[in-house]
Every structure is written in structure tokens, then in C-alpha cells.
Amino acid sequence: LPILEMLQPEIQSVQCLILVPSRELGLQIEQVWKKMGTDYKVNVCYGGHSIDTEIKNLSNPPAVLIGTPGRIVDHIERGTFRVDKIQTLILDEFDKSLQLGFHEQMSFIIGKLTKLNKRVLVSATSDIEIPRYTRVVNPTILDFIPENEAETNLSMKMVVSKGKDKIGSLFNLICSLKSQSAIVFCNHRDAAERISDSLNEKGIYATYYHGGMDQDERERALIQFRNGSVSYLITTDLAARGLDIPEMNHVIHYHLPSKEDEFTHRNGRTARMTASGTAYIIAHESEKKMDYIDYGMEVFKVENATSLPKQPEFKTI
């Protein structure tokens, strides 16, 4: 809404640039913008999408342009849109973009915005040297972390797997929870597919989601999960943030991420605001222990499943 107030209808050029680390986040922001019912045009640009189509769309300049850093650099170098009227730059999921190696592209873009009124809004979840990356001197920091981080509605429980292959433990956990849906996080694309296939063979309706899928496949998987056609989304950290996914009562860590930040984002899919949720960690004694995990947490014992969870209702997608 503050961005809306700053836009000027008489300026027929891009006035606000939003950089995002992924096309999914960009498309989500575009959808939210359109739901606001504003007359201001918005476009989204990202790698893997037809650049010719994007160039055609940008010939009638939007007031708000959303894009991944690499694709925005490409358009700037081609001179597809003017940068001299951009007054607001938003770096959404700024820390994620840095983790993905977009530092050089973001520096290039910021360097081109010479007439920027220094309205730089940064979204980050880790301790980042904001002035170093954004060229902003003495920025105003808005900290939304609760004063007492211990006051959380998230509980964590450990499921000890007897075997290195944790499929059996995951299956029994799902059946024990009797939950109609959950997100299962793993660390590798092939693992997401393997786990999904194994669960389906056991009668659990699941689908996988990862960065190796093309855009149509990924969107189809999300639609299936959102509308309840499948109950379990088996995914990499790609779904840990930046996606419009309903809040879950449970998230399950089949693998633990190497970084605590990603663990935090995964858990952010549950226990939002005043809601309660539980994160389950499936662990085997042979696995590397992570410094950020309290291995003395409550152990959740699962028995061999005797019945399957309620099957989802099939819907048209």
C-alpha cells in the first residue's frame, strides 16, 4: 500500500522495481498486486520465460516491475525499459538472493539506478551488512523479531529411525498423525521424487516439488497440494519461503538443512502468528549432528501403521 501511494499515474515508465530470488515469489507478488484491484500495470520477468514476450510486454511500461536479478540485468543491458524514473527498489528475500549468488547482478542493478530516491526496502532474515550491499547510509532497521523469541507456538519433536532409509519411519509418522496434509522437507531433488513415489506406493497421496522441474510441472504440483488433491508435498528448500502455501499444522524434516536459517524458514510453514504447529525431525544415529538442533528434545514414538490417513478428495486441476 505505501508503494501505491508513491506511484504517479502521469509517469509512463517503471517507478518501482522489485527483485526476487525466484520466479515463484515473483509470480506470487504479481498475483497479490492484481488482487488489490489497482489500475497500475505490473509485469514479472524471470529466467526460463520467453524474453521476447517480456520485451513485448515492457514496450507498454508497467508502473511496477518484478523480476529475478539475472533477467532484470538482461533487460537493462538490452535497454528494454527505462531506469531513470525508478524511485523505489525492493529487495525481497534479500538474503536468499545472496545465497543463490546474485550479488554481482544486484550490485549492477543498484549501480544503474542513479536517480533512485534511496527508498530501499530490504527483507532479510539473517544478519546482513545492508549498507555494504545496498549503498544505503544509516538505514532504518525495522525489526519484527519478538522481544522474547522463546515465546513461540512451535513445538519440535524427534522421531528416531531404526534404519538409514527413513521411508518406513516417515510412513508410520504420517499415519500416526492422522493429519490431512503436511510438508516434508528433504535436501535433494532425487530424494524428493523417491520419497514421493514410495509414499504413493504405500497409499499416501503425495507429490514432489523442486527446482529441477519445469514451470508448468511446479505450478501443477502446487495446485494439487493447495486444492487438496494430494495431501503431502515432498520438497526441497525451494518451498521453505516465498510461496503461497496454506499454513500447515505439521512440517516434517526428512533431512536437516546445513544452515539454521533454512531450518527456520522451513518451520515457518507452521505455527504462524497465534496458531500452533509442530515440526518433526526424523533422525538416524549415523547422520551428522547439527549444532543448531537440541537433540535432547522430546522423542515422538511411532508404531507400525495399522491404518492409512483419510484420503483426499479428488478435484479438477
Q: Can you describe what each PLM-predicted range is?
A:
Residues 1-317:
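Conserved helicase RecA-like core
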